[in-house]
Amino acid sequence: MKDLLIGTSTRYEWNQLKNWAKSIKNTSFSGDVVLVVMECSVETVKTLEEHGITVVPVNKTLDYKSNTPVHVERFIHMYHYLKNNEYRYVISTDVKDVIFQQNPIDWLEENLDNKKIVCASESIQYLHESWGNNNLMSAFGKYIHNEFYEKEIFNVGTLAGEHKYIKDLMLHLFLASINRPIPIVDQATYNIMMHTEPWSTITKQAKSEDGWACQLGTTGDPTKLEIFKPHLLENIPVYKEGEVYTSTGDLFYIVHQYDRVPDLKAKIDAKY
């Protein structure tokens, strides 16, 4: 059975998608690469398809009773695609700020063990990350904030696992994110799920040092690292000639938020 890499895009052009698209093709990944698009130029669609990316326009006939921002709406469209297409492993990532340095399927086969999903740590707790901490409070209020503000943060932009579990995770993320007091709630919703049953039992909570995915918004951003570093739960990534490694020298499979590190972004842009 085939594997899948899936992402979503709205109003992104090829220049914003090329690093994601080209980098996965630069690995040994042999599964389907699908981009669900809400709005996209004909020229960009053509270029994506020329690079082996399957472009899936959103199904505008779906009636899901929601007027949500695109970063929440994306989950129902990915759920709809997964409901109608069967795979073994499914990898879902952001697309504008993600690249692949190795085939992510290799990591899943070697490390997922008896778990069904993998989530990627941001290497910091909510109480030490002001944006996330405020977002959690604004999305769910004081009671829920008090329950979770000491928890480790996991990033919703780099998740993966077995098909049926990722499919249903997409549905639950959508359902739990709609009708909230603020529009940006997907990250807070995801973290509450990852820290509660049944999700916490079936999910491998991957540290940055496990090499699955680095989250450079907290572990690499030079404008924030001085503030975050005393509170980080593990060592920070290392850069070598435009590649990103764990502190022990293992090449990351996925690099997320590389655009937060200007020198690294310049090298990645030049490569792809």
PLM features: residue spans?
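Short polar catalytic/cofactor-binding loops
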Residues: 9-13, 123-125, 259-261
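Short N-terminal binding/cap micro-motifs at the start of the first secondary-structure element
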Residues: 13-17, 128, 264-265
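GT-A fold catalytic core of metal-dependent nucleotide-sugar glycosyltransferases
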Residues: 75-132, 167
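Short conserved micro-motifs at the rims of enzyme active sites and ligand-binding pockets
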Residues: 130-131, 262-270
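Short, flexible, basic/aromatic active-site loop/helix in glycosyltransferases
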Residues: 134-150
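Catalytic core and acceptor-binding pocket of nucleotide-sugar-dependent glycosyltransferases
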Residues: 148-266
